[in-house]
Amino acid sequence: MKGTADKQALDALQKNLNIYMQTDPLFMLFCPQKAKRSDFADKYFTYYLEKWAEKKQLFISESRKTAVTLIDPADYRYKFSGKNSLPLKLSGNSYSVFVHRKAVESIVSIVVPVQKNKRILTIYGNPAENFDEIIGLVKQCMKKAEDEGFVLVYETLSKKLVTAMEQMGFEIGYAKQFMNTQFFQTVMTYNF
């Protein structure tokens, strides 16, 4: 697991994620228009990857095909600002990103007591192609949670990894349809 990444690694990761996230429910929520999703994913990762890497919130697989982020919900921001923000603002999808983020923050504040340190685990990649890499990154995040004493909170709009996460010791704390969408949201915790 790498906490930092050079420009070449970020570029390779972004290229792979732009492809994988086309059919990911999170990006389908963020950008419902399939024809625009690739462009949106490119803008999203251009904006976020470098920021996550600088804050040591981004962890990349050796193949650069999958990544996870560990973000404290207290660090969530509800605006895009700074480098590479304008294209994302103009994409027309900011509202969806922020609605999802606020919903996650609200659910986590109910599932995990306020006084507990926590990190939101988000997985970027294709479980069908890179399952072992994803599980490897998750296991390293689990160890980090144990070592540093925080609750690891996995939030997903896909059921693809829920069973695997349960087998590793995650527990479902919340599972419901996401607002009035076609997506089913699951929030799981580890090291609670």
Q: What positions do the PLM features span?
A:
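Conserved catalytic-core motifs of GNAT/GCN5-like acyltransferases
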Residues: 171-187
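Conserved GNAT acetyl-CoA-binding A-motif
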Residues: 118-120, 145-157
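Active-site rim helix/loop that mediates acceptor-substrate recognition in acyltransferases
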Residues: 34-57
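Short hydrophobic/aromatic beta-strand element in the GNAT-like acyltransferase core
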Residues: 55-60, 67, 120, 185-187
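Conserved acyl-donor/pantetheine-binding loop and adjacent beta-alpha core of acyl/acetyltransferases
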Residues: 66-128, 144, 179
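Conserved N-terminal entry element of GNAT/NAT acetyltransferase domains
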Residues: 1-12
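Conserved beta-strand-loop-alpha-helix junction that forms the acyl-donor binding cleft
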Residues: 123-129, 153-163
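Conserved acetyl-CoA-binding loop-helix of GNAT-fold acetyltransferases
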Residues: 128-143
